[in-house]
């Protein structure tokens, strides 16, 4: 049996377009006043069913991220609110596939921001793969009580409340096979302190390269490549986008971007089918 890839729709986040494409709008002497544009970007996760493993790439936002008692700080809720019906949260999307978090053997976390690692706490029996530098960054925000970033202190507190099977990828480990046709890629620093991708080969088509926020959209990808508005390391980001292009083109893989509205709308969602 070959690999199957399910695309999980986990709702949307409403953001200033400049967060996604840097300098999307800017003032000039000729146009001293320019209005920014709000856009709704998809939040997603990907489930890969293999012969001997069930792998999840990212976990979306926590179901209780919003509201007066929500996980996210008030400023985060104002700046980039989450929008999603109850059926869009990750545990519910898994239930729709007759799965529970306990059925997931491995969770690959592209990075540990609020819209990608919000549901980590539900996976007490899974191996959790994260970049060692990204893990250290998240724990530092938790330890210092710093609520100013996309690393959510209340989420991290829940992760660390009980022992978990963390598998941290070192800086020098570039690639690792997780299952036949499924390879973990270490993109290193860029959008965040440590980004991980996933290459998934399929039987009926070449497959996909899942890159998450290492490259938000096709516009960021180019060519010419354009930087995102939220970056930890600009040089690392540029290097990563070039590496993604070389890796995908040399293997005929389709790049699935982190928050591309048009691309995501075109994909078959888990409620309607899968890729194989």
From Swiss-Prot:
This is N-acyl homoserine lactonase AiiB. It is an enzyme of class 3 (hydrolase). Gene3D superfamilies: Ribonuclease Z/Hydroxyacylglutathione hydrolase-like (3.60.15.10). SUPFAM superfamilies: Metallo-hydrolase/oxidoreductase (SSF56281). Zn(2+) 1 binds at residues 111, 113, 191, 213. One of its GO terms (molecular function) is metal ion binding. PANTHER family: 102 KBASES UNSTABLE REGION: FROM 1 TO 119443 (PTHR42978:SF2), QUORUM-QUENCHING LACTONASE YTNP-RELATED-RELATED (PTHR42978). Zn(2+) 2 binds at residues 116, 213, 259. Binds 2 Zn(2+) ions per subunit. The lineage of its organism: Bacteria, Pseudomonadati, Pseudomonadota, Alphaproteobacteria, Hyphomicrobiales. Keywords: Hydrolase, Metal-binding, Plasmid, Zinc. Its EC number is 3.1.1.81. Its cofactor is Zn(2+). The keyword Hydrolase applies. It comes from Rhizobium rhizogenes (strain K84 / ATCC BAA-868) (Agrobacterium radiobacter). It catalyses: an N-acyl-L-homoserine lactone + H2O = an N-acyl-L-homoserine + H(+). Pfam families: Lactamase_B. Belongs to the metallo-beta-lactamase superfamily.
